[in-house]
Amino acid sequence: MRRNGKERKDRTSGGSQRPYQEIVGRTWIFRGSHRGRVTKRNIIWHELIGLKVRVVNSMHPGFVGIEGYVVDETRNMLVIVGDKVWKVPKDVCIFEFETEDGAKIKIPGERLVGRPEMRLKKRWRKW
């Protein structure tokens, strides 16, 4: 550990260069009872973080078969943690989400593109 010259405070190194590495391989994920029921009709507006997901089909063959839990979501990517960490683009994949009651919901990634808070405002056609 190095010292800061002027203020004489201890400096520690920055955070991990690989985020989410500390939870790789764990079988649990935080799932509170406050979560609403996820159904096929409301999954577009629902929070995806914490749901179990599997990539069923993709334009890129390297993404097919990835499965784990969603730990982060950006506008165009899902961060999935299973036995390692993957950043999967939403628009080129078809995802299969598993709900708490064991139901499996397939949804094309194009329907999920956008920030989670902006998806609430967007109007969707029935599908």
From Swiss-Prot:
Assigned keywords, A-Z: Cytoplasm, Endonuclease, Hydrolase, Nuclease, tRNA processing
SMART domains the record matches: POP4 (SM00538)
UniProt cross-references to SUPFAM superfamilies, sorted A to Z: Rof/RNase P subunit-like
Swiss-Prot/TrEMBL GO biological process terms: tRNA 5'-leader removal
InterPro entries, sorted: RNase_P/MRP_Rpp29_sf, RNP1, Rof/RNase_P-like, Rpp29/RNP1
Subcellular location(s) of the protein: Cytoplasm
Top-level class of the enzyme under EC nomenclature: hydrolase
GO cellular component: cytoplasm; ribonuclease P complex
Superkingdom of source: Archaea
EC number: 3.1.26.5
GO molecular function, one term: RNA binding
Catalytic reactions on record: Endonucleolytic cleavage of RNA, removing 5'-extranucleotides from tRNA precursor
Subunit (UniProt): Consists of a catalytic RNA component and at least 4-5 protein subunits.
Role: Part of ribonuclease P, a protein complex that generates mature tRNA molecules by cleaving their 5'-ends.
HAMAP family in the record: RNase_P_1
Family the UniProt entry places it in: Belongs to the eukaryotic/archaeal RNase P protein component 1 family.
Protein name in UniProt: Ribonuclease P protein component 1
Organism: Pyrococcus abyssi (strain GE5 / Orsay)
Gene: rnp1
